[in-house]
């Protein structure tokens, strides 16, 4: 996973052309960037919005309520609809998600979960909770990769403390990112990362399967010895 984040970070801060002329970004943890790229605050390339506040008494069932996306609905960088909550309260149109929105966890008891995000695909009449925010922009997949790079991780770490583990709208909007405005270059970076990340995910899944097999074998071996089905060899 750390290697995957490093690959993403390299692509969204250095580009794909190793011979590109570079300049200093002015951001210590980013270093040099391609000369024609810019350093912008993320609020300059899109808009963010905080989620719906609701009470426990607003909870209802699927047939009568509006689905509220929460932190648990983001799994492995994708939207998961296996743990759903519905509310009966009125939801304004500006609090309903649209295709291409980036859903971000902005507050959580676990600081490791703050900042996790996923792109909204085809969801209709769906809102998002108060501990979440959405970011709406013209290049969602490109920005999604920026938000899954070390740039975002370092930024979160710059203001997190032992008592502050939330991403406010102001903090998010003022985050400095490296940005290339050329849509063709954005598209090439996205295509490269789609392919590379798919390859890495396959390797990770394969390693996890191997570890699961070894864990099952270990449990089986322990069971056989503690139940006497196998005996521990004794050296005479």
Q: What name fits each language-model region?
A:
Residues 1-19, 149, 179-236:
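Amphipathic alpha-helical coiled-coil/heptad-repeat segments
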Residues 21-25, 55-63, 159:
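Short coil/turn segments at secondary-structure boundaries
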Residues 25-52, 174, 179, 183, ...:
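Non-catalytic DNA-recognition/assembly elements of restriction-modification systems
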Residues 43-58, 67, 72-101, 124:
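Sequence-specific dsDNA recognition surfaces
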Residues 75-88, 102-128, 141-145, 153-162:
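Short, ligand-facing micro-motifs at secondary-structure edges
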Residues 125-131, 141, 161-187:
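A short glycine-rich beta-alpha junction/loop motif
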């Amino acid at each position: 996973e750390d290697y995957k984040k490093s690959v993403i970070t390299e692509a969204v801060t250095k580009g794909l052309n190793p011979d590109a002329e570079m300049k200093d970004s002015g951001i210590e943890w980013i270093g040099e960037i391609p000369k024609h790229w810019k350093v912008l605050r993320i609020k300059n390339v899109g808009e963010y919005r905080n989620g719906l506040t609701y009470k426990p008494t607003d909870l209802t069932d699927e047939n009568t309520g509006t689905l509220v996306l929460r932190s648990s609905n983001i799994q492995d960088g994708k939207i998961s609809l296996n743990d759903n909550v519905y509310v009966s309260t009125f939801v304004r149109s500006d609090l309903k998600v649209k295709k291409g929105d980036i859903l971000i966890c902005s507050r959580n008891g676990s600081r490791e979960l703050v900042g996790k995000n996923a792109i909204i695909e085809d969801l209709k009449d769906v809102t998002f909770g108060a501990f979440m925010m959405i970011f709406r922009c013209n290049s969602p997949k490109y920005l999604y990769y920026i938000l899954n790079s070390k740039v975002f991780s370092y930024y979160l770490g710059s203001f997190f403390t032992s008592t502050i583990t939330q991403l406010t709208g102001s903090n998010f909007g003022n985050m400095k990112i490296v940005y290339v405005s050329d849509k063709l270059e954005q598209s090439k970076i996205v295509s490269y990362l789609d392919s590379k990340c798919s390859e890495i995910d396959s390797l990770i899944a394969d390693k996890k399967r191997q570890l699961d097999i070894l864990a099952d074998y270990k449990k089986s071996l322990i069971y056989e010895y503690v139940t006497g089905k196998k005996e521990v060899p004794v050296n005479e």
